[in-house]
UniProtKB/Swiss-Prot annotation:
InterPro entries: MIPOL1. The gene is Mipol1. This is Mirror-image polydactyly gene 1 protein homolog. The keyword Coiled coil applies. Residues 65-169, 218-255 form a coiled coil.
Length: 279
């Protein structure tokens, strides 16, 4: 009874626009209340609805019609809402799944990017470390080489200073000694200092002798070259004179009185030219 009463109340609350059946034309109904003058058994008259005239339904039929249409409409609306709710839930689940997938994908991309950055950073740090180590090794090698060169230069300077001091301590009279005498003094020396001293004297003597010989040789070569140049110049002059005489001999055909003198002059020039060539 309660369910029927609630359905009736729901049917009474539904407006007339919601009671339209699908596929049926909407009609305007007007309920006629019984006239008080005629009593309860009076029937409703026909009234005008819009521009058309339709018979008026009795007011006793309206509650049942409202109840049936309301229940059918509500059931259909409930099914539509359920279907829409199901679709929305499916769409929401799909969107939630897509959201979680995108979130997981984004997290994986972030982790991959972090791993890539970490790997690159480690490789860069390792490269910088190796470069720094190679640079340090190169600097140490250069320092060691510089120290070695410095030590060698210092040793060479000390050796040169010692040799200079030994040469300064040499007696000038010892320069007049022969090489054999110096060698004898080295053989007869008792100490290493004496040997070094006599050896320095021998080396100095050899250097001086070599320099003197080179100087003498250069002077002699210069004199020889000068003599050669002078002889060549004289040969050229004599040769030119011989050519001139030949030309004069050929051109002076009219002068035949003294051929013997000209021939003698030519022989003299040839003789002088031969002598100059021999020299």
């Amino acid at each position: 009874m309660n369910s029927e009463q609630s359905i009736r109340e729901l049917g009474n609350e539904v407006p007339s626009e919601d009671l339209e059946l699908p596929g049926r034309k909407t009609s305007n109904f007007q309920v006629l209340q019984p006239c008080r003058d005629e009593g309860a058994s009076a029937e409703c008259s026909i009234v005008e609805c819009g521009k058309n005239y339709e018979p008026v339904i009795s007011h006793q039929v309206i509650p049942d019609l409202n109840k049936e249409t309301s229940v059918a409409y509500l059931q259909k609306e409930l099914e539509i809402l359920r279907a829409s709710n199901t679709k929305l839930q499916e769409k929401l689940a799909k969107e939630d799944k897509e959201k979680r997938r995108l979130k997981l994908k984004l997290e994986l991309q972030e982790k991959a990017a972090e791993a890539d950055i970490a790997e690159r950073t480690a490789a860069l740090v390792e490269e910088v470390y190796f470069a720094q180590r190679e640079r340090d090794e190169a600097i140490m090698c250069r320092l060691q080489l510089a120290l070695k060169e410095r030590d060698e230069a210092i040793a060479h300077v000390k050796h040169m200073e010692m040799s200079l001091k030994m040469l300064e301590n040499i007696n000038p009279k010892e320069n007049d000694m022969t090489l054999q005498e110096l060698l004898d003094r080295i053989n007869n020396a008792d100490t290493g200092i004496a040997i070094q001293k006599n050896g320095a004297v021998i080396v100095d003597t050899i250097y001086k002798t070599t320099g003197c010989r080179k100087r003498i040789t250069a002077e002699e070569m210069s004199a020889v070259l000068e003599e050669r140049d002078a002889a060549l110049s004289q040969c050229k002059q004599l040769h030119q004179r011989l050519l001139d005489l030949k030309k004069q001999n050929q051109t002076s055909t009219n002068n035949t009185k003294h051929p013997t003198a000209k021939n003698n002059q030519e022989h003299t020039l040839k003789y002088n030219l031969n002598i100059a060539s021999i020299n």
